Regions:
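N-terminal, charged low-complexity regulatory/assembly segments
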Residues: 1-114
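Short, hydrophobic/aromatic alpha-helical segments in well-folded domains
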Residues: 44-47, 186-187, 218
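A local structural micro-motif
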Residues: 57, 211, 230-231
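Hydrophobic packing positions characteristic
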Residues: 66-186
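Short amphipathic alpha-helical interface segments
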Residues: 169, 173, 179-208
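Short amphipathic alpha-helical interaction segments
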Residues: 209-221
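A short, conserved structural fragment
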Residues: 223-234
């Protein structure tokens, strides 16, 4: 509605003010909004929540509602706007912010609407590599982190950020955080962001630059994980 009636604007503003003023009597909707935001943050950013603690999170949600002009009510928009709110303030330390941003990347890969179409990497493919293309999973994000990631926890490392991960959603709709070596990052970056290489060309170029590197085994490994896609030329 581009031009809502004046009375509607007044009523909406009054409700928003009640919500922002806190948990006051007579504003059950405000309680609902706070609980909803709190639930979104808890479910989307569990590592971050564990690090900051319950009381600090309650205050962060309160500050978010009081100070951030959120425009979209959907679950994923609340999560994104909460991250933006934290990024533009001094609410948490740098390490906690990086944990939050990593979890947002994983969440972004989960809800990405891109279609994952994985063709098996069989011997037939390698018999005719000129007939196939090689590309990255469209939900892929490459990140460098000061911690190591497992499915249930993160482990802070003492050194400067040097843990490389590929975060993506596979064909089984699972979000994967795959640890990478520097050589993996370099090769994957040649296929990003949306570049689609001939399988034959990629093999030849890689073999020319890395004489002792088994590029075929490397491709098989990452197509099996779902990080790389092999498709018939023309698809």
């Amino acid at each position: 509605m581009l031009s809502p009636p004046g009375l509607m604007l007044q009523q909406t503003e009054a409700l928003a003010q009640k919500i922002r003023l806190g948990r006051i009597e007579g504003c059950q909707y405000g309680e609902f909004i706070r609980d909803n935001v709190f639930g979104v943050v808890n479910n989307t950013f569990p590592f971050f929540v564990e690090r900051v603690g319950h009381q600090a999170l309650v205050q962060l949600v309160e500050d978010f509602l009081l100070q951030h002009c959120a425009m979209e009510p959907e679950f994923h928009h609340i999560a994104t706007e909460f991250v933006q709110f934290i990024q533009h303030g001094t609410w948490v330390n740098q390490l906690d912010l990086m944990v939050l941003e990593y979890e947002w990347i994983a969440f972004s890969a989960e809800i990405d609407q891109a279609r994952i179409n994985i063709e098996s990497c069989s011997d037939i493919v390698y018999q005719n590599p000129e007939q196939y293309t090689l590309s990255c999973n469209p939900t892929l994000h490459l990140v460098e982190l000061p911690f190591e990631v497992s499915s249930h926890s993160i482990q802070i490392t003492d050194s400067a950020p040097s843990n490389y991960y590929a975060v993506f959603r596979n064909a089984q709709h699972h979000v994967v955080s795959q640890k990478l070596r520097p050589i993996d990052v370099a090769l994957i970056q040649t296929l990003q962001p949306s570049y689609c290489s001939s399988l034959q060309t990629f093999q030849q170029q890689t073999e020319a630059q890395l004489a002792d590197f088994d590029v075929r085994l490397w491709i098989q490994h990452f197509t099996h994980l779902g990080l790389l896609n092999i498709n018939t030329l023309g698809e």
